[in-house]
Amino acid sequence: MKVDNFPQARPQTGLTAADIVFEEPVEGGITRYVAIFQCHGAPVVGDVRSARNIDIGILGQFGHPLFVHVGGIQPVIDNILSSPLEDFELGNYTTTVVQHPAGRYAPYDTYTSTTAIWRMRSTASHPPLPVFSYSKTVPAGASVTSVKSVSIPFSTYSEVVWKYDPRTRTFLRFYGSTPDTLSNGVQNSASNVVVQFVHVYYGPWLENSTGGLEVQANLYTHARGKALVFRDGVEITGRWSRTTLAQPTSFTTTSGQAITMQPGDTWVELVPTYVHVTTTH
């Protein structure tokens, strides 16, 4: 599901029910989320926004997922329709799946329910193969460094900080020093935070009236890059690679050993290679 992250869209709703959340760069230095719901649902999720071409690269590794969004520019929609993704454009549906909560205004007022969507399209997609490997302990032999926080300055709009909380064994999400909380007051957190460095470039398509070009990234055609995996209060330096659209992304240590995740929810930060990520130890 495509969820907005523009400052006016905050606080969001329903993200804590997602199994995996991808944060992707889009035009103008802002980011958006692709939230994966499989094990759990949410009665309200949003606000839901438009698709981007990068979403196909993110979601192709999940087989034939149901991709919920609110429209997009025509070249992107054409690419989605010719991809393995099952398109679910909320603009084509009535209030049976679309919610417009009081106090929200366009374009930040389109919400939905995973329950309602699954009820309508229960046979549209099938459970994908796992995209991560899991273990309750840090992989034996992996070179690790204790970490207190990781800072990801996407832009002045999104200066993301994750801080490790030993009590809950999770990383808590902040914007600078301000907790990133949802509409119910719960702070976003994750058992695993993956920083996946990607080469981004600007495509030929205008995304908005101010001239913002579509942000593109190669996530699957013999793609590879640096990765940082944070779990259990440690940092694991490694690499990521992916050969085809249908293949899950592989995360390995610098020596080639598979990096496993802590059982629980995972946030994947798709970070442009020019962004300087820092950690405190």
Identify the residue ranges that each predicted region occupies:
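A surface/extracellular/periplasmic glyco- and lipid-processing/surface-interacting theme
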Residues: 3-22, 27-281
